[in-house]
A protein has these predicted regions:
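Hydrophobic alpha/beta core scaffold segments
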Residues: 3, 8-319
């Protein structure tokens, strides 16, 4: 099907649970097509884990072709991994042109199969596919939603890490798990299971970007889906009033845009699991669709401008 669709038109694709105009679906195919009022260039970065910078020549050429204006262009991407390398690569090309980045990591691959993305009807491992989209009749805005808040003003510093494993070994010179357990009162053997309630956050200026724990070593090292660098400022977070946060996000979007023609969103699998557990996800999907035509995907990680994040919703709103 993918090959037949792509005979005439460039297209990109990913795998995952889909949200389409208020409906949630784990199977089948959702297709979004642009027919007018946009300029689009699609591309692929192969060998993403080894040398993503090799794709910048083509990316810069395509940026020049669409001539981005002020707040009217976005780069939407889907990747199989190597997120930090890819975000750095995209930022080097997009930031000076005022182009926002919104993307997601593949999630939902069958057991034993490698993650893949699709480009022009072909499947690729270790890759990132993207679409540069310029709105010729209105603005494009990108939003990041965080439903977690700092548990306290207490911050910690990553004093020992292994970036190759996305492992946080020590905070403030102590095993990371010991610091987490002492501050939150969570037994060490319950830390990873507690990720939906109390993830960690990396502070960058006034913003906090979530890093989700996915494992713990016997020495108290915490492995994560988002890389933590040495000397990063880390906070422990707690789940806030997510329904109120969702409402505030929708109100802000409606306030910013006079007319919404499309909403594209990327949600984290952990948000999906939390909302499913709370019996809220179907309501959430309908609420997103109340903004206008909506297509969402649930991924294993999210990319927002110059950051790779976890447990976050990123959405692109077209006027």
């Amino acid at each position: 099907v993918g090959s037949e669709m792509c005979i005439r038109d460039r297209c990109i694709g990913t795998i995952g649970t889909k949200l389409v105009n208020g409906q949630v679906n784990d199977s089948g195919l959702a297709v979004l097509g642009f027919f007018s009022d946009v300029k689009i260039r699609c591309g692929i970065i192969t060998e993403a884990s080894r040398c993503p910078v090799a794709g910048t020549t083509q990316l810069l050429k395509q940026i020049a072709e669409i001539s981005p204006g002020t707040d009217d262009t976005v780069c939407v991407e889907y990747c199989t991994g190597s997120e930090e390398k890819l975000v750095t690569t995209f930022t080097s090309c997009l930031e000076t042109k005022g182009i926002h980045l919104a993307g997601g990591t593949v999630f939902g691959v069958p057991d034993g199969k490698p993650p893949v993305v699709a480009y022009n009807g072909e499947l690729y491992e270790d890759a990132c596919v993207y679409a540069l989209i310029k709105n010729t009749t209105g603005k494009i805005r990108v939003y990041k939603e965080n439903i977690y808040e700092k548990t306290s003003a207490q911050s910690h510093f990553a004093t020992k890490v292994d970036v190759s494993r996305k492992a946080l070994i020590e905070l403030d010179g102590r095993p990371a798990a010991d610091v987490y357990s002492a501050e939150l009162g969570i037994p060490r053997d319950k830390i990873v299971d507690n990720v939906l309630v109390n993830p960690m956050g990396r502070a960058v200026g006034n913003q906090v970007f979530i890093s989700s724990m996915n494992g713990m070593d016997t020495d108290g090292t915490l492995t994560n889906y988002k890389r933590i660098n040495k000397n990063d400022c880390i906070y422990f977070l707690s789940l806030g009033d997510y329904k109120a946060t969702e409402q505030q996000t929708r109100q802000q979007i409606q306030q910013d845009a006079s007319h919404i023609s499309l909403v594209l969103s990327i949600d984290c699998i952990y948000r999906y699991l939390l909302y499913e557990k709370e019996g809220y996800f179907s309501t959430y999907a309908k609420d997103m669709a109340s903004l206008g035509p909506h297509l969402g995907i649930v991924g294993g990680g999210e990319q927002y401008n110059n950051q790779h994040v976890n447990q976050t919703m990123v959405c692109v709103v077209f006027e």
